[in-house]
Regions:
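Single conserved hydrophobic/aromatic residue that forms the stacking wall/gate
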Residues: 1-11
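Carboxylate- and glycine-rich phosphate/diphosphate-binding segment that chelates Mg2+/Mn2+
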Residues: 29, 36-121
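Active-site-proximal loop->helix
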Residues: 12-33, 174-175
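Structural motif
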Residues: 22, 30, 39-41, 145-146, ...
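C-terminal charged capping/lid subdomain of soluble metabolic enzymes
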Residues: 61-63, 163-242
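Active-site segments that bind and position negatively charged phosphate/pyrophosphate groups
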Residues: 81-191
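Short coil/turn connectors at secondary-structure junctions
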Residues: 5, 36-38, 207
Length: 242
């Protein structure tokens, strides 16, 4: 039987309870993998003290993602405790991980093999995030930093596509900043980013799909037309030159 002992923040609060493995290929991230539920997961917070700031922030990104998708209560708890989490307060860290793991475990229990659409919400921020990782070169940015950038992009895309409020965009930016996840000072040409997105495993029939937040705790999976994606990618690219 499979047993997992988690030593990394990102794994502990996210992939440890996903029951999924993935291998990165030159063409894209996690393009080969399988589903296998562990017999149990051991998550000791004591070893988190060994993580550097980059890996710590990486895990915080996945917790922030969970809070946006889950509920007002989780999100505003994160807003209230972001500074303490970034400072590694042990009580806050334990609570944040517990909330994130419960959220993901509940989602996975409903859709263990990504066949019902429920689990798609866990890809929030990952469509642009995976493209950033692939084009910048794996390891250039942490997975969490790339996902945080993808969350910023998806929220702004959501304003035009599903009516996401400007208040949500600003609140999410504030949370990510407080967790040590500033906007990346990096970009790639819009056409290259779109091509990388089309190689992502979430693409269907050539259509790039985004998880977009209508509101905190309310999301929609949308196949966004290429021209709309390119328009927003050009805005994103231009914002890096300011």
């Amino acid at each position: 039987s499979l047993r997992r002992r988690q030593r990394q923040m990102c794994i502990r609060d996210s992939s440890s309870v996903g029951g999924k493995t993935g291998v990165n290929l030159p063409e894209g991230k996690n393009l080969v993998g399988t589903f296998k539920q562990p017999a149990y997961v051991c998550a000791s917070t004591a070893v988190l003290a060994t993580l550097d700031d980059r890996e710590w922030a990486c895990g915080c990104a996945e917790i922030a993602k969970a809070s946006v998708i889950d509920s007002d209560e989780f999100f505003f708890w994160m807003m209230d405790h972001a500074s303490a989490l970034e400072a590694r307060d042990p009580v806050v860290v334990t609570e944040a991980i517990a909330r994130s793991v419960v959220f993901k475990a509940n989602v996975v229990a409903e859709d263990k093999t990504e066949s019902r659409g429920v689990r798609e919400c866990l890809n929030y921020g990952h469509t642009l995030g995976h493209a950033v990782e692939a084009l910048a070169g794996y390891g250039t940015f942490s997975h969490g930093a790339a996902v945080a950038e993808g969350m910023r992009f998806a929220a702004r895309l959501g304003v035009d596509v599903v009516g996401t409020s400007a208040e949500l965009v600003d609140a999410q930016d504030e949370l990510l900043d407080a967790l040590g996840l500033p906007a990346l000072a990096w970009s790639a040409p819009a056409e290259e980013m779109l091509a990388a997105m089309k190689r992502d495993k979430k693409t269907r029939a050539g259509e790039v799909r985004f998880v977009l937040p209508r509101d905190i705790g309310d999301w929609e999976l949308v196949a966004v037309p290429d021209e709309v994606i390119l328009e927003h990618l050009r805005r994103w690219e231009d914002s890096k030159s300011l």
